[in-house]
Amino acid sequence: MHKLIIHGGTPLKGSINISGAKNAVLPIMAASILTDKLHITNVPKLTDVSTMKDLLRSHGADIEIIEHQDEFELIIDTKNINNFTADYEIVRKMRASIWVLGPLLTKYGKAKVSLPGGCAIGARQVDLHIAVLKAMGAEIEIEDGYINASSKGRLKGTHFVFDKVSVGATINAILAAVLAEGETVLFNCGREPEIVDLCNCLITMGADIAGIGTSEITIKGKDSLNKASYKVLSDRIEAGTYMFAAAITKGDVKICRIDYHIVKNIALKLIETGIKVVPINNGVQVTYEGKLNSVDLETNPYPGFATDLQAQFMSLMTLSSGVSMITENIFENRFMHVPELCRMGADIVVRGNKAVVRGVEMLKGAEVMASDLRASVSLILAGLSTSSKTVLHRIYHLDRGFQDLEKKLSNCGADIKRV
């Protein structure tokens, strides 16, 4: 099994190009079921993308892959979909597999999807996915670990209030509603840029969607959608991770190919800590200027601070000048990186959904183990900050969400190798 060996202590200097957003491309790939052909560009080279390709192919899709140096193009032909079951062997690898449920059900009137897998960071129940589809007229039962869904005729437009903000359920509801009969109004929706990107792709395909980027989305169902071509937006989580990498290594890095407005809340949080962050053409520049203040943080649905960056921010705060409180409001069990950071000398105490981080002068290299995707990259950041050797095990998590991570960091001076 592969591992990463990191010899830290070198400030990162240079530029990093951001890849396409994993959390946007996966639902867009699922949306291909709604039409006959979808051409997607700026697709990141990630194992989660490969898993979604395998899933779509298992349903009968034909996928042409055009490989470029930094990205894929995908041409997905779904006119011959003939299998409506998403099997456990594929779905267990990735929670995003649940997003084929809405498209299969709304276009073909039936779907059988295994309960999903992915990172072990909490329950992430599918209750809201099921509730909104039932509100559209679907008949759904959970049997033997599968969601069995069917509808008599087309799904029907509905008014539905999510009792809590759910990115995943918002996506499934939108994917189902675009081909439902009549108007669907969704309240308390997720507002994430990746949801906006999905909606923009669906509009390119001929969907009628209003309220994009707000908590109230109105969808007028169509009889069918068109072939389309769409470029996926860049990954704000990857961008934020490298912004924190620049800060924790006391470096100076230009983060390129990212719109500043979708990382603005990350930039503002870094500025609070004393890091210099300025917008540049098609990106942002992050520069350490000699201090790192302790800052409290709460994760919240967008436009709040993303839970997917909480672990990376915690790594940064382990070296701050005071005490910070980090509150995780999205997922339970998302402090699994804390024991590993403490092995490296961090002073962190977890109390429920809060972590108290007391800054230390320096971290020390150690052998550590990744528990999930975001935890793994937080340990890399910690390793980059030390003047000694860190060995990270179970790095297969990284390849689910970060393209060419070692290469991008090495190009900025990091000593990081996969063995």
Curated annotation (Swiss-Prot):
InterPro entries (UniProt xref): Enolpyruvate_Tfrase_dom, Enolpyruvate_Tfrase_sf, MurA_subfamily, RNA3'P_cycl/enolpyr_Trfase_a/b, UDP_GlcNAc_COvinyl_MurA
Chain residues that bind phosphoenolpyruvate: K22, N23
Listed EC numbers: 2.5.1.7
This protein's record includes keyword DNA damage: no
Pathway connected to this protein: Cell wall biogenesis; peptidoglycan biosynthesis
Active site, UniProt feature: C119
PANTHER family (alphabetical): UDP-N-ACETYLGLUCOSAMINE 1-CARBOXYVINYLTRANSFERASE
Entry GO terms, CC: cytoplasm
Pfam family membership, one: EPSP_synthase
Localization in the cell: Cytoplasm
Reaction(s) catalysed (UniProt annotation): phosphoenolpyruvate + UDP-N-acetyl-alpha-D-glucosamine = UDP-N-acetyl-3-O-(1-carboxyvinyl)-alpha-D-glucosamine + phosphate
Keywords: Cell cycle, Cell division, Cell shape, Cell wall biogenesis/degradation, Cytoplasm, Peptidoglycan synthesis, Pyruvate, Transferase
Name under which the protein is recorded: UDP-N-acetylglucosamine 1-carboxyvinyltransferase
UniProt-listed HAMAP family: MurA
Residues where UDP-N-acetyl-alpha-D-glucosamine binds: R95, K164, V165, S166, V167, D308, I330
Residues that bear 2-(S-cysteinyl)pyruvic acid O-phosphothioketal: C119
Gene3D superfamilies recorded: Enolpyruvate transferase domain
Role, per record: Cell wall formation. Adds enolpyruvyl to UDP-N-acetylglucosamine.
Alphabetized GO MF terms: UDP-N-acetylglucosamine 1-carboxyvinyltransferase activity
Gene: murA
GO terms of biological process kind: cell division; cell wall organization; peptidoglycan biosynthetic process; regulation of cell shape; UDP-N-acetylgalactosamine biosynthetic process
Family stated for the protein in its record: Belongs to the EPSP synthase family. MurA subfamily.
Main location: cytoplasm
